[in-house]
C-alpha cells in the first residue's frame, strides 16, 4: 500500500487527494452504521447458532441497501456544502462501497471468529496487489481523481464475494431483530466507541476542506496517511488477532489485565521511539516517498508524528 501510495502521489495533484479525502470522511461516517459493533459481538458471543448468524447477515444486507440509498441521495448536499461539483459523482460511486462493507460484515467476521488468520493475510495481500496495480494503470491512462476510488470499491467488493464463498449465507426474508438482540448489549458499546473515534479522527478534515481548501486538505491528508501507516499496520495486525483469542478468556479478568499490561509496555517500547524517529526524519521521508511536490506536508507530518507513540499504545485497547 505504501508503494502504491507513493506512485499515485507522483501522478495526481494534492487537490485530487483533498477532494477524495472529503468524500471519504462522509463515507466513513455512514460506514459506522454498516457494522454497529456487530463484528466484535459475533466474535465475543459463543452461543450464537448458525441460524442467528444468517439472520444477522440479512440485517446487514438490508442496512447496506438503506445506507447506500441514503448516502447516494445526500451527495448533492455534500457537493453544495463544499462548493465542489466533483464530489457529486465521487460520492455516488462510493455509495456502492457501503453495501459491500455492510453485507460483508458477517462472512468476513467469521474468518476472525474461526481464527483463520493465514487466509486473511493471503487474501489481503493478493487484493492489495491487484487493486493497487489497477489504480496505477488507471492513473497512467489519465483517470485522474477517479483513480483513488478503485482501491476502496474493488477491495470491499472482492472481500465480500470471497468471504461469502467461504462462509455462504442464505437469503431470508427477515430483519433478524431477534438474533440481533442477543448481541446488542455488547455491540452497542462498540458502536458508541466507533462514533466517538470517528469524530476525533475526521472533524479536522471536514473543517480544513470547508474553510481552507481542497489543496491544503490534500497536503494534510497525505501527511496524516503517512503518519498513520505504522499505527494502522500494528492495529490491523494486533486487534483482529487479539480479540478472538482474548474472547476465550473473557471471564478471567486477572489474566486479561496481565496481558493488557504486557501489551501496553511492548507497544510503548515500539511506539514512542518510532514517533521521535519520524519527527526528525520527517523531511527526508516525505520527499523520498511522495516527491518534492508534497514538501508543504512536511511540517504537518512532523507535528503529527509526535502522537504516534500514544496512538500505538492505545491501538490495542479495543480488543480488551
Model-identified regions with their sequence ranges:
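Membrane-water interface segments that mark the loop-to-transmembrane alpha-helix transition
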Residues: 1, 23, 28, 32-76, ...
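Signature of the first transmembrane helix
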Residues: 1-38, 62-75, 92, 127-136, ...
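Helix-terminus/linker motif at the lipid-water interface of multi-pass membrane proteins
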Residues: 2-16, 79-81, 139, 198-229, ...
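Helix-loop junctions and terminal segments of transmembrane helices
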Residues: 33-50, 112-113, 223, 227-271, ...
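C-terminal transmembrane helix end/exit motif
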Residues: 39, 106-113, 117, 137-141, ...
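Alpha-helical transmembrane segments of multi-pass membrane transporters/permeases
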Residues: 50, 54, 60, 91-92, ...
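Alpha-helical transmembrane segments of multi-pass membrane transport and lipid-handling proteins
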Residues: 58-83, 89, 93, 133-141, ...
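Interhelical loop/hinge segments that connect adjacent transmembrane helices in multipass membrane
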Residues: 118, 161-206, 241-258
